Each structure stands twice: as structure tokens, then as C-alpha cells.
A protein has these predicted regions:
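Helix-loop-helix hairpins and the membrane-proximal interhelical loops
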Residues: 1-51, 164-165, 197-283, 424-428
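Helix-loop-helix junctions within the multi-pass membrane cores of secondary transporters/permeases
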Residues: 2-38, 59-60, 80-89, 93-138, ...
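Residue-level signature of catalytic and energy-coupling elements of molecular machines
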Residues: 21, 41, 125, 193, ...
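Short, hydrophobic transmembrane alpha-helix segments
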Residues: 37-49, 69-72, 90-95
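Transmembrane helix-loop junctions in multipass membrane proteins, especially transporters and channels
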Residues: 43, 68, 72-76, 121-122, ...
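Loop-to-helix transition at the N-terminal end of transmembrane alpha-helices
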Residues: 45-65
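Transmembrane alpha-helix interface/packing and boundary motifs in multi-pass membrane proteins
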Residues: 63-76, 185-190, 251-258, 289-299, ...
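Membrane-embedded alpha-helical modules
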Residues: 95-208, 325-433
């Protein structure tokens, strides 16, 4: 036991074991919805849902364990909400790449992230993207995720005259609306694991509605589903073009900003921050994140990143890797509960998707809307992400518009050289399309 304490940075004289374990459980409950949502999203590309569930649970366990041992911090990892939507609905369903090519892109992104972390280049990447655009990108992804949830449940449907309209009143759409309201109520009441409980409740409600289908001979516990359908399923040949290069760049910086933002935000005002305001062992935490992304791609899931829900465990008093270790153990246990999680209908996850969108939207209040040179590119970023149904297009158009507005309004010194180069490459891509 003493060896484990040392590996995770737990000092019994300084920290309370019960508090750390409770914090780990709290973190797991608040983020366990990913075990239902991620397979649901990625399976739209044709990936095997059972294999994706195993990949999700396994990569979450491994990534969180790496955080515990390398960084000794109370953070948990899992496939990113937002990037999984980018993977499925932009990269595969919109741009037309195979899911094998998308997995290859994620694997390469992880390797690049590892290199950037080892050589301390990540700071240059962070400085490349203007602060207001970072917040706008987060808000835009929030809108995008919510739109996906509503569309998949039939709450919003296609319409030739108005492009989109409200769908028909069906058991599926009804269950989705119930999930949205229930999720909102539980979060308002500050219930730990609100999204998880909402998904469970909607799955149960879906039984009499005929939405939740229970197969004959159902058993809640089984051996983990096979990884074979997704394990090492890479198509590297598809990466040899400009679109994929830009896509990998987008994945890298989304992962970096997601991780840095979560680490700094959740660790603020705790002893995990040093006197300069930096997160202790942040390099090790970033390295764990990068390795987990490549491991996740090998298993068969989209980018693994540090979850903002880790803040729930930290709020419960989690301060060391023991919190992360206990969360990791719970993800391993979840591997054997695949039948339960795979029973969850898509409509039951709509509430979680919409509420995650709402939480991500909160970053829009950080955008400086009084400065039009900042507000317009931010607005373009958010709007085009949703209207083009493409996160990458929104990011690209936001960066280009930011650079052009600053350049022609005489504020060209506010744009760094890296952003000029990136914007020029993005603009060239549109010209050559």
C-alpha cells in the first residue's frame, strides 16, 4: 500500500484517504455519461458500438491512471466531448473520410502532442490562437454538440423551405425533451452525477415508451466486448493531403486548449498551483494526455483529453493521484457492465448533449464583444460551426477573419507570425477548393 501511496503522491499525514476515494467516485459519476454518449456518437460512422464502448472505458482508465502515476494529480481523462463530434460528424460524415482514416489522424495527433510536450513547444501553440477565439471555439462546439443531440433524437429535422424545423411528436423526441428538462433540473439542484442519473432515468422511462429495447436473455454483466473491430484499424494513406494536415492541426490545438484550460481552471485556488500561478506537474499531465490519445486511437476511439468534470472531485477535496487512481478503477469495473451501457437509447443521451452544450456556451461571456475586431471573428466562428455542420470550418473561418480584420484595421501588430502563416495556409486552401 505504501508503494501505491508513493506512486500517486498520497501522504497519509497530509491527506485523508476517505476524502480522496470519495472524490474519485464523484468524478466518475459526473463523467460516466461518456460511456453511453461516446459509443452512440462514434457508431454513427459505422464503428462497432460494443468495441467503441470497450475502447472508451479502457482508454479512460489508462489515461486517468497515467495522470495518477505521472502527474500525481486528481484529474480524470476520457474521449473528449466536442472532439468526438468533430471526429464523427465533420471528419467522417461531412468530409467523407473513413473512420479508419479518422483514427489514424487521432493517432498522429497524439504523437505530435507528445513531441510538443517533451520539447515544451505547446506554449507557442497556445499563444498562436487569440484569447477571444479560444472562448468562441468552445462556445461554438457547445452549440454544435447540442444541435447534434436534438437532430439525432428527431427534435430538429430537415426542411426544404426553412432548412431545419421542429420534428414530429414521437416517443423518441418526447424522451429526448424529458431528458433535457430532467438534466437541467438536476444540475440546477447541484446533484452530483446529474447527467449520469438523467441518462439512467430516461433509459428506464424509455421502456414503456418502446424506445429502450431489452433483448431476450439480457444480463447486465458480461466479459468486456471485443476490441477486434476497431483495434489498430488505421488508414494512414488517407492522411496524405492538405485537408487532413489541417485537420490534424485542428485536433492538436483543440486537445491542447482543452487540457490546459481544464488543468488551470480546476486547479485554481488550490495547493496544486505554485506561487507563479502554474499547475504543478503540468508537463507530466500533458504528457499523460498525449499518450492516452494515441492509446485511445489504437483501441478505437477519438481524442482522449482531461475532463472538466474532474473539478467535481476536486471540489470534494481530491488533491492527489489517489483520486485519479480510484476513478480509473471504476472505469475498469465499467468494462464488465457493457450490456447495461449499450442498452441506453440515443434519445436518452440527448439531455446530456444539450446540457454539455450549455456548459460550454458559458465561455462566450469571456469574449470581448465591445471590440468589433474581436467580436466579429468570434461570432463567425460560432455561427459557421453550426451552419456548416463542421467544427473545422468554423475554426478556420474564425482564424482567417480575425487575421484579416486586424490587418486591415491597422491592428496588425496584435497578430503573431504563427497565426499569419496558419491563416495564409487556410485561405490558400479555400482559394484552391
Amino acid at each position: 500500500m505504501q508503494a501505491l501511496y508513493k506512486w500517486v503522491g498520497f501522504d497519509p499525514k497530509k491527506y485523508n484517504l476517505r476524502t480522496e476515494l470519495l472524490a474519485g467516485l464523484t468524478t466518475f459519476l459526473t463523467m460516466s455519461y461518456i460511456l453511453a454518449v461516446n459509443p452512440d456518437i462514434l457508431s454513427t460512422t459505422g464503428m462497432d458500438k460494443g468495441a467503441v464502448f470497450t475502447a472508451t472505458a479502457l482508454s479512460s482508465a489508462i489515461g486517468t491512471l497515467l495522470i495518477a502515476f505521472l502527474a500525481k494529480l486528481p484529474f480524470a481523462q476520457a474521449p473528449s466531448m466536442g472532439i468526438n463530434a468533430f471526429f464523427a460528424f465533420t471528419l467522417v460524415l461531412s468530409m467523407g473520410y473513413s473512420w479508419q482514416a479518422a483514427l489514424a489522424a487521432v493517432f498522429v495527433e497524439g504523437i505530435i502532442f507528445i513531441i510538443l510536450t517533451i520539447f515544451n513547444i505547446r506554449e507557442q501553440i497556445v499563444r498562436c490562437i487569440p484569447k477571444n477565439l479560444r472562448f468562441a471555439i468552445s462556445a461554438g462546439i457547445g452549440f454544435f454538440i447540442a444541435f447534434i443531440g436534438l437532430k439525432n433524437a428527431g427534435v430538429i429535422v430537415a426542411n426544404e423551405a426553412t432548412f431545419v424545423t421542429l420534428g414530429a411528436f414521437t416517443p423518441v423526441s418526447t424522451l429526448a425533451v424529458i431528458g433535457i428538462i430532467l438534466s437541467g433540473v438536476l444540475i440546477t439542484l447541484r446533484v452530483r452525477g446529474a447527467l449520469f442519473y438523467s441518462i439512467v432515468a430516461c433509459t428506464i422511462i424509455g421502456i414503456p415508451l418502446g424506445v429502450t429495447q431489452i433483448p431476450d436473455g439480457f444480463t447486465p454483466v458480461s466479459m468486456p466486448k471485443s476490441l477486434a473491430p476497431t483495434f489498430l484499424q488505421f488508414d494512414f494513406k488517407a492522411l496524405l493531403n492538405m485537408d487532413m494536415a489541417l485537420t490534424i492541426f485542428a485536433l492538436v490545438f483543440m486537445d491542447i486548449f482543452n487540457t490546459v484550460g481544464t488543468l488551470i481552471g480546476a486547479a485554481a485556488k488550490t495547493e496544486m498551483m505554485d506561487e507563479k500561478g502554474n499547475v504543478k506537474n503540468i508537463k507530466e499531465a500533458m504528457l499523460a494526455d498525449a499518450v492516452a490519445t494515441s492509446v485511445g486511437a489504437v483501441c478505437g476511439t477519438s481524442t482522449v483529453t482531461t475532463f472538466v468534470e474532474s473539478g467535481a472531485g476536486i471540489a470534494e477535496g481530491g488533491r492527489t493521484g489517489m483520486t485519479a487512481f480510484s476513478t480509473s478503477v471504476l472505469f475498469i469495473i465499467a468494462l464488465f457492465l457493457a450490456p447495461l451501457f449499450l442498452l441506453i437509447p440515443s434519445a436518452a443521451t440527448t439531455g446530456a448533449l444539450v446540457l454539455v452544450g450549455v456548459l460550454m456556451l458559458s465561455s462566450i461571456q469571456e469574449v470581448d464583444l465591445t471590440d468589433m475586431s474581436e467580436a466579429l471573428p468570434s461570432f463567425i466562428t460560432v455561427l459557421t460551426m453550426v451552419l456548416t455542420y463542421n467544427i473545422a470550418e468554423g475554426m478556420a473561418l474564425g482564424l482567417i477573419s480575425y487575421t484579416l480584420v486586424k490587418l486591415f484595421s491597422g491592428q496588425w501588430r496584435q497578430v503573431n507570425l504563427t497565426l499569419y502563416i496558419v491563416s495564409a495556409l487556410l485561405l490558400l486552401r479555400y482559394i484552391l477548393m
